[in-house]
Amino acid sequence: IAAPRVLDLCAGTGCLGLGIKRFCPAAQVTCVEKSPEAFVYLEKNCRCALKGQGGQTEDLLEPAAFEQEAAPAFDWGPALNALRAKAKPAYAVQPVEGDLFTYWQGLPEGQLDLIVSNPPYLTAEEMRHLQPEVAQEPAMALEAGKDGLVFYRALAEHYQNALRPGGALVLEIGWQQRQAVAALLAANGWADIECRKDFGGNDRCMISHRPEK
């Protein structure tokens, strides 16, 4: 597919979506994030990435890049500056402030080639025993209900129709969640379910597809 249509859910600051755009510049990528705090950085990263398209992406978290991107090249005058302030900014990847649990309701059927997501996946019990460095992260980015599966359940149940036949769903998972997530996908009719390991040898990525027929 020359220009795949990609949706990144629970995008955070845009690592997955921007990474896809980096390696496939023709991709049409939308990143969806619920957290207002994270969305600020998602917007900035998507805008800054314009400078680095075509395999030259700069450090997207470099504060100086934000300052340089935000500064006008010259004074357009009061009238034009006011219009520019209201204009929709240009993005390499389209950021959307939205909720994974409801965003599917507005998606047309069969229009996406790929959905990716690195959702929260810690259980309530795991949240009570976090390592100190992890405990500093926002709970919203970590917690996924009593069983750690609430996001995977929503993805498995509601997002298949948004993909074209044969389109792929790629999910990061916790190292102990392979069987549970695979079962959710199978129960909802996903095809060609497989798991990939990370460099540490742990189960880390579930891949599945909308059936061709």
What are these regions (language model features)?
Residues L100-T102, F199-G200, E212:
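Residue-level detector of flexible, active-site-proximal loop/helix-junction positions
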Residues Y121-V150:
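Mobile active-site "lid"/loop adjacent to the S-adenosyl-L-methionine
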Residues Y121, H209-E212:
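C-terminal beta-strand of the catalytic ATP-binding
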Residues I1-E62, F66, A70-S117, L122-M127:
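Conserved SAM/SAH cofactor-binding pocket of Class I
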